[in-house]
């Protein structure tokens, strides 16, 4: 069957405004509603209070010399304070970029070097991380601490009444101007900063808002490092909804308690987080009838596990979606129109969202031929939510000759134009829902004087964890070192998630193609086969 283009028209109701103008206007509109609640302390804040604090911090940042298109970085778990400098940056046309406190110094310093921030807002517990990272990146950046500090300015010192705050209005700008940088690994393996404009990100948020779910009360526990957390923030502003904040992690008992207490209507669970919920024996003791939608995505999840999620959250639509940091959500089911498909097509990623055009060119990776129904190939797409570019980096190689983004994901669509994603072309893999970039760990391995060659890949562990980082290593002649010593050497230089949990395996040579390219898949498959033989 010949290939075709899957497409859905744009929404017509998206406001043509900057993110600052949007947040300011909606905060005024819903000023008496609760904006967010800290589930740990039970403190809450209205949209009026949040807007007032954002204005004060915006004016304070201006006094510190922040000008339009300067980069402002936030490194913190999510609290009532965390989104204030984010929205304040929108108000003064600064560009926002976010880091996660669990990243290593090596990762953080690289990301900081990509964007050269003017100012960094950091939680008290992560000041040491930022100090070391700035030193390694050779950057001199203003540091502001959420909490107490004798060395740096504090967030509370910026959040003070300003004489002209009542007259404040957000700075106007071209809606195509970059306002958000979101870090992603990219298909080449090295992290990049993805540029989203006011238009692209507001469009992505409105598309999500119109997806048929109820966003009255969103449970939020990931940092703004993740694009999903940013979209949930903007989505809640659209209709004056509230977000329930519960730190960086949520245990199963807390999850069900919060759903019942705050009458949560929407949650997003990365597949790895669903296992805690489905393995929690007391889930029936909690009232989850308010929960309209459970959205899953980011990594693969089996149909078996999705059915378990359906069973635990019996009142909810459990939807598995597909999206990219470069675009936001691209395919998902609408619970108001696709009820039957949600239950019948377990494991499907849904249909294309508003403003998305998708080739299921799908594309044959060898011939570039556009494929048809139920034929697997690379997914390529265009979207009204597409990023502008990579910050200070060339992105031309990531698009084909027709302007479609080459996702590096393998998938197919069926006779109902529903998308399935089945594999990745990219060399990176995911462990506990986190992207692991092989080259980043390989660079650490090469710092060891005894390592001549090294290849890192993901070794399948189990459905919950995904793939664990594993290395095949060729030693220098005469080198006497053990696999355990190499593992410990790497562990001391990378984040916890990058540790070589799959082990280090010494080999005599690394197989390559006639053109000299490393045959990473063959190395991985040979090791898996060898381990299976040894088991038997």
Residue ranges and their predicted role:
Residues 202-217, 225-266, 280:
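Conserved AMP-binding/adenylation subdomain of ANL enzymes
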Residues 44-48, 179-203:
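Conserved AMP-binding A3 loop
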Residues 264-269, 278-344, 359:
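Gly/Ser/Thr-rich phosphate-binding loop
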Residues 31-32, 150-151, 162-183, 190, ...:
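Conserved pre-ATP/AMP-binding loop-to-beta segment of ANL
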